[in-house]
Amino acid sequence: MATGGTVRPAEEPEEEEEEEDEAVEEEEEEDYTFLPLVHDIIKCMDKDSQDVYQELNELKSKFQAMRKLVGNMPGIDMSPEEQQRHLQSLREQVQTKSELLQKYKSLCMFEIPKE
């Protein structure tokens, strides 16, 4: 199957995906950190710079974005006790489904075709 392009080993795409995932994670971590902004504000204050107001506005908008993000999280409207009950219910469902899956596997109703 010649496509005119170079053939890469099968491992390369996975490595590229891992690198992309790490880059996205780093980007997301930066979105949730406030320390660099606070540091910039302190530096501006030390220099008596007029950029302090801009930095403060950036910090304020970041806090607002985080409040919105937290407000939209699933389960935020439930108490910790309700969350624990819900978690326990989900664990029981997983346990039941795992047991059923093992039961169905042991029935040997599914034949694996021989090639």
Swiss-Prot record:
GO terms for molecular function: transcription coregulator activity. Residues 12-31 have a biased composition (Acidic residues). InterPro entries: Med7/Med21-like, Med9, MED9_metazoa. Residues 31-107 form a coiled coil. One of its GO terms (biological process) is regulation of transcription by RNA polymerase II. Component of the Mediator complex, a coactivator involved in the regulated transcription of nearly all RNA polymerase II-dependent genes. Mediator functions as a bridge to convey information from gene-specific regulatory proteins to the basal RNA polymerase II transcription machinery. Mediator is recruited to promoters by direct interactions with regulatory proteins and serves as a scaffold for the assembly of a functional preinitiation complex with RNA polymerase II and the general transcription factors. Belongs to the Mediator complex subunit 9 family. This is Mediator of RNA polymerase II transcription subunit 9. It comes from Xenopus laevis (African clawed frog).
